[in-house]
């Protein structure tokens, strides 16, 4: 009976690791891609910024759909909730702030005023995303510790 319990616990930890890794890897791609997105926006070239915006927005939306489609882990929703919070922040910023700005750019190259707006939007995005990153990192560490994932990592 003790052996069955130990095997069952070890199996739960392996499933927890797989669940965590799936969320972590999905969200990490979005986080890492934000740097390329920022570079494209701050190239001050309309076509490059729009192309990057469409690609990044699609990535955020598909990742959000993937996370929303996942079930909780045995009643624990912490990691899922905070990953969705981060992704919704990106989605709302892209849809409600950056996209309207990009649609308003008239020329191929940003005007001096548009350059200032682009810089301001990126500063705001960067400053705001830190709080969401911190909350997501907290949730990931909490899940890692509570589910004893270290016991199945090598």
Language model segments and positions:
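Short, charged/polar, low-complexity loop and linker segments
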Residues: 36-39, 62-75, 109-117
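Short, charged, amphipathic alpha-helical segments
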Residues: 50-57, 80-85, 112-124
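Immediate post-signal-peptide N-terminus of mature secreted/exported proteins
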Residues: 9-54, 146-154
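Sec-dependent bacterial lipoprotein signal peptides
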Residues: 1-9
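A structural signal for well-ordered alpha-helices, especially hydrophobic packing surfaces
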Residues: 34, 38-41, 60, 64-67, ...
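Short, solvent-exposed, charged loop/turn and helix-capping segments
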Residues: 63-85, 99-105, 140
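A charged, solvent-exposed segment within the mature domains of Sec-exported extracytoplasmic proteins
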Residues: 105-154
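Amphipathic, heptad-repeat alpha-helices with coiled-coil/zipper character that mediate oligomerization
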Residues: 26, 51-59, 82-103
């Amino acid at each position: 009976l003790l052996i069955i319990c130990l095997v069952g616990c070890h199996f739960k930890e392996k499933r927890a690791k797989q669940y965590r890794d799936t969320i972590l890897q999905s969200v990490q791609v979005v986080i890492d891609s934000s740097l390329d997105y920022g570079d494209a926006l701050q190239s001050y070239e309309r076509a490059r910024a729009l192309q990057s915006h469409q690609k990044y927005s699609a990535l955020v939306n598909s990742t959000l759909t993937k996370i929303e489609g996942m079930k909780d882990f045995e009643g624990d929703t912490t990691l899922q909730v905070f990953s969705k919070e981060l992704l919704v922040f990106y989605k709302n910023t892209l849809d409600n702030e950056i996209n309207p700005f990009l649609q308003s750019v008239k020329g191929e190259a940003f005007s001096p005023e548009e350059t200032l707006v682009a810089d301001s939007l990126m500063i705001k995005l960067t400053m705001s995303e830190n709080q969401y990153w911190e909350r997501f990192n907290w949730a990931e560490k909490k899940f890692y510790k509570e589910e004893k994932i270290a016991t199945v990592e090598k």
